[in-house]
Amino acid sequence: MADKKGSNSEKLLYCSFCGKSQHEVKKLIAGPSVFICDECIDLCNEIIRDEAAAAGVEASLSRSDLPSPQEIRDILDQYVIGQERAKKILAVAVYNHYKRLKHLDKKDDVELSKSNILLIGPTGSGKTLLAQTLARLLNVPFVIADATTLTEAGYVGEDVENIIQKLLQNCNYEVDKAQRGIVYIDEIDKISRKSDNPSITRDVSGEGVQQALLKLVEGTMASVPPQGGRKHPNQDFIQVDTTNILFICGGAFDGLEKVITDRTEKTGIGFGATVKSKQERDAGEVLRETEPEDLIKFGLIPELIGRLPVVATLGKLDEAALMKILVEPKNALVKQYHKLFAMERVELEIRPGALQAVARKAIRRKTGARGLRSIIEQALLDVMYELPAMKGVSKVIIDENVIDGDGKPLLIYEDTPKVAGSN
């Protein structure tokens, strides 16, 4: 753009892109016979960021960036204790899924099908944590849905397409990103068919939801209201293709081991058959023998089982595993409480006997790893309440008696030790 003269005869410079003068913008940068203002630079950066984000969906999952199954397993090991076989199965399944996505555009005679995952294991065994860790590792959108809140479309409750709406919300409504995300559907066992016999009453939260989930899991164009609104006629919908979304379904499947045991005991008959007694086989060992027919008998419809070809079973966590969970993972509970107390400039010591008592209590409550935090929180409540107002406390010691409710934390002052709550 040609230079123009101002009324005071000074030579004004103008942006070659938007035409604004040097007085209308904060900064004007000169190039060979051209100028660009700071506003145009910001606009260019915004365009580049948007294009890079769209391209990043492809680039982030390219072969060079995709971790190998062993690398995925190593990262899972940092957050999840035990469940070695389940971690190996998940690592291979997730690697193959995103490797498949990379080759979607390539024309080939062999079309690779999606392999969704079914996790079977007791409460607190690490099902949800495994799915969360995978999503964080791969840097893809992730959402957890509770199957018990879902109903068929037209009934009170959430319909299955709400799951995709939440996934979109998690990635700021970037459809390309959402279409390569991970959905974890928890409590899938709670929507099992109520009985083998068809009923005249509609099973809107059982088999009906399974039928509704079927299309979503297999791959369909889901219609989602924009920006989290409710569905109503004459409204534009966001179309999301679920074909390449990885679905991981999880559930405790209480009673499934009995179905498996009944089947295996019937087949384990005759000379040379080795049949272990029920006492010799723990639930985890029994669940490893899960077959599609067992899941059908439990109440899942055959079509849904067919869409969940990868089955990983998780065992019940024993005392040793729970103690490791308390101290070993990157974000272990004991490390978290150490940090909380360090913020008060106080050292926290949880003795091995206390860790063992926490693990024993979680096993008695049948809450698995999920119940560990509430046990520690309960034991530390009084001292965390009193500590901010106390002066001179340098250390807090927690032993087995504190966890069992038979004692109080020992407070070490800069001069003498004292028991919490005593004056």
Curated annotation (Swiss-Prot):
InterPro entries (UniProt xref): AAA+_ATPase (IPR003593), ATP-dep_Clp_protease_ClpX (IPR050052), ATPase_AAA_core (IPR003959), Clp_ATPase_C (IPR019489), Clp_protease_ATP-bd_su_ClpX (IPR004487), ClpX_bact (IPR046425), P-loop_NTPase (IPR027417), Znf_CppX_C4 (IPR010603)
GO biological process, one term: cell division
Keywords assigned by UniProt, alphabetized: ATP-binding, Chaperone, Metal-binding, Nucleotide-binding, Zinc
Pfam families found in the cross-reference section: AAA_2, ClpB_D2-small, zf-C4_ClpX
Positions that bind ATP: 122-129
Residues where Zn(2+) binds: 15, 18, 37, 40
Entry function: ATP-dependent specificity component of the Clp protease. It directs the protease to specific substrates. Can perform chaperone functions in the absence of ClpP.
Similarity comment text for this entry: Belongs to the ClpX chaperone family.
UniProt protein name: ATP-dependent Clp protease ATP-binding subunit ClpX
Organism per entry: Burkholderia ambifaria (strain MC40-6)
Name of the gene encoding the protein in the UniProt record: clpX
